[in-house]
Curated annotation (Swiss-Prot):
<keyword id="KW-0547">Nucleotide-binding</keyword>
<keyword id="KW-0744">Spermatogenesis</keyword>
<dbReference type="InterPro" id="IPR018370">
    <property type="entry name" value="Chaperonin_Cpn60_CS"/>
</dbReference>
<dbReference type="GO" id="GO:0005524">
    <property type="term" value="F:ATP binding"/>
</dbReference>
<dbReference type="GO" id="GO:0007301">
    <property type="term" value="P:female germline ring canal formation"/>
</dbReference>
<keyword id="KW-0217">Developmental protein</keyword>
<keyword id="KW-0809">Transit peptide</keyword>
<keyword id="KW-0896">Oogenesis</keyword>
<keyword id="KW-0143">Chaperone</keyword>
<dbReference type="GO" id="GO:0005759">
    <property type="term" value="C:mitochondrial matrix"/>
</dbReference>
<dbReference type="GO" id="GO:0005743">
    <property type="term" value="C:mitochondrial inner membrane"/>
</dbReference>
<dbReference type="GO" id="GO:0140662">
    <property type="term" value="F:ATP-dependent protein folding chaperone"/>
</dbReference>
<dbReference type="GO" id="GO:0008637">
    <property type="term" value="P:apoptotic mitochondrial changes"/>
</dbReference>
<comment type="similarity">
    <text>Belongs to the chaperonin (HSP60) family.</text>
</comment>
<dbReference type="GO" id="GO:0007424">
    <property type="term" value="P:open tracheal system development"/>
</dbReference>
<dbReference type="GO" id="GO:0048477">
    <property type="term" value="P:oogenesis"/>
</dbReference>
<dbReference type="GO" id="GO:0045041">
    <property type="term" value="P:protein import into mitochondrial intermembrane space"/>
</dbReference>
Length: 576
């Protein structure tokens, strides 16, 4: 005969109360193993699918809703990746990790974000599958990184330098989605300002793209205080026909800059102060004059450090016809400033991160003398760091600034085209830096043969190598699929071909990719595979994921538990 037992009232109440305490203390959602990996992979898939449709010459556009203004239409992989946020937190973590791959590739190489995203998805997917069958995640990652080093070495061997304007034009055209006019524009800009010159992309005001070369200097220091901003077209300071005050030392007191402010105000000209730094007293004087009096003034920290900062200030002074205060060779005190001591420029644009001085009024003979001195110093220098810094200064002094104004019939069209122009410009710079390889995913397919001969220390490492071998086929396969053909057949055919031969997706033909102008910058391909493998292989080693518990869910759980406890206490009081 079965006996039935009943909890005592005290035990019932204790059980209910402990449940209430547990629910109230529970603030994080923790999940483990295959379940959470599958959810992250779903997020990776959503992001990769959205980005992959833009790949190749026949890739499609993506329309992104914006919180303000018209929707954005783009074919830029990193813009699409950045726009994606998923409701499910575990899926969103997977998406965000691949988003980081796209961002890192974009920052380092300026292009190749779609390739990096497609590769990251392939590596993560294969990695999860192998781990679910019992392979060691750590050993798989080691195998993946071993394969990546072999791929990077092979890409360097395949690479060839970019020398002619025609090759530069080809690289830019491919990155601009086959837009020859953009390729020509960038090639022309590089020809005008040189490979080390500064090229800036802006919104145009006409239907056509325009190239304007302005003699000027740009450096990576912005305004010290946002109170200097004087335009509603973004967080910028814009002045026309401005005076420049250069100071090598820190400006400590307000009285030391008052004479300069009075001179500028008397001439009704804007004043830009470029100094090592400004202490609080001097800075507050400028800000108060800007806000209360309406004085057109802005303060910027001088670029560089130590001797390099001093030389940068001297370059600017020569280019604009001013002097540098605080310099040992110049004994004039800041308080004794005269109008002839100011530098002069036709236009100044200062953002949060950089400053552009355009149309400097310095004497050409003095500028040429300074340029020649720099060239001699570069030849004599034995330090690669010093050479690099002097090369940057030479570019600013001699080359000027090229402005690419992107035209179009609407803001949406200009925005879409501007994304492509920036991509093309970044890709071109990367190509000039490290050379080019055959495009269309061909270079990565040529690395597969090298991996066939590579062996890891154990079977799990060999699985990691196999994951990369399979992933290398994905860019070519995705380009072919977007062109409406069988991707697997195209990949199989290209693998049989030799050297530079690959698939021209635009024409639907096989041929020599270099001769057809279908090329990728080596740096872009190398960065894409390296970043994708690094993040995706780390993703596969994850065993647990912790997220915040949604507030409404936590509150509901607490309320339900509270009601249950009250009910339990009531029944206990009734003697049940």
């Amino acid at each position: 005969m079965m006996r039935m037992f009943r909890y005592t009232n005290t035990l019932q109440r204790t059980a209910k109360i402990s449940h209430v305490l547990w629910a109230r203390n529970y603030a994080k959602d923790v999940r483990f193993g295959p379940e959470v990996r599958a959810m992250m992979l779903q997020g990776v898939d959503v992001l990769a699918d959205a980005v992959a449709v833009t790949m190749g010459p026949k890739g499609r556009n993506v329309i992104i809703e914006q919180s303000w203004g018209s929707p954005k239409i783009t074919k830029d992989g990193v813009t699409v990746a950045k726009s994606i946020a998923l409701k499910d937190k575990f899926q969103n973590i997977g998406a965000k990790l691949v988003q980081d791959v796209a961002n890192n590739t974009n920052e380092e190489a300026g292009d190749g974000t779609t390739t990096a995203t497609v590769l990251a998805r392939a590596i993560a997917k294969e990695g999860f599958e192998k781990i679910s069958r019992g392979a060691s995640p750590v050993e798989i990652r080691r195998g993946v990184m071993l394969a990546i080093e072999t791929v990077k070495d092979n890409l360097r061997r395949l690479s060839r330098p970019v020398n002619t304007p025609e090759e530069i034009c080809q690289v830019a055209t491919i990155s601009a989605n086959g837009d020859k006019s953009v390729g020509n524009l960038i090639s022309e800009a590089i020809k005008k300002v040189g490979r080390d010159g500064v090229i800036t992309v802006k919104d145009g005001k006409t239907l056509c793209d325009e190239l304007e070369v302005i003699e000027g200097m740009k450096f990576d220091r912005g305004y010290i205080s946002p109170y200097f901003i004087n335009t509603s077209k973004g967080a910028k300071v814009e002045f026309q026909d401005a005076l420049l005050l250069f100071c090598e030392k820190k400006i400590k007191s307000a009285p030391s800059i008052v004479p300069a402010l009075e001179l500028a105000n008397a001439q009704r000209k804007p004043l830009v102060i470029i100094a090592e730094d400004l202490e609080a007293e001097a800075l507050s004087t400028l800000v108060v004059n800007r806000l209360k009096v309406g004085l057109q003034v802005c303060a910027v920290k001088a670029p560089g450090f130590g001797d390099n900062r001093k030389e940068n200030l001297m370059d600017m002074a020569v280019a604009t016809g001013g002097i540098v205060f605080g310099d040992e060779a110049n004994m004039v005190r800041l308080e004794d400033i005269k109008m002839s001591d100011f530098g002069r420029v036709g236009e100044v644009v200062v953002s949060k991160d950089d400053t552009m001085l355009l149309k400097g009024k310095g004497q050409k003979a003095e500028v040429e003398k300074r340029v020649e001195g720099l060239r001699e110093a570069i030849k004599e220098s034995t330090s690669s760091y010093e050479k690099e810094k002097m090369q940057e200064r030479l570019a600013r002094l001699s080359s000027g600034v090229a402005l690419l104004r992107v035209g179009g019939s609407s803001d949406v069209e200009v925005s879409e085209k501007k994304d492509r122009v920036i991509d093309a410009l970044n890709a071109t710079r990367a190509a000039v830096e490290e050379g080019i390889v055959p495009g269309g995913g061909t270079a990565l397919l040529r690395c597969i043969q090298k991996l066939n001969d590579l062996k890891g220390a154990n079977e799990d490492q060999n699985m990691g190598i196999e994951i990369i071998r399979r992933a290398l086929r994905m860019p070519c396969l995705t380009i072919a699929k977007n062109a409406g053909v069988d991707g697997a057949m195209v990949v199989a055919k290209v693998e049989i071909l030799d050297g530079d031969y690959g698939y021209d997706a635009l024409k639907g033909e096989y041929g020599n990719m270099i001769e057809r102008g279908i090329i990728d910058p080596t740096k872009v391909v190398r960065t894409a595979i390296s970043d994708a493998a690094g993040v995706a292989s780390l993703l596969t080693t994850a065993e647990a994921v912790v997220t915040e518990l949604p507030l409404e869910e936590a509150a509901a759980a607490g309320a339900a538990a509270g009601l249950g406890a009250l009910g339990g206490m009531g029944m206990g009081g009734m003697g049940m």
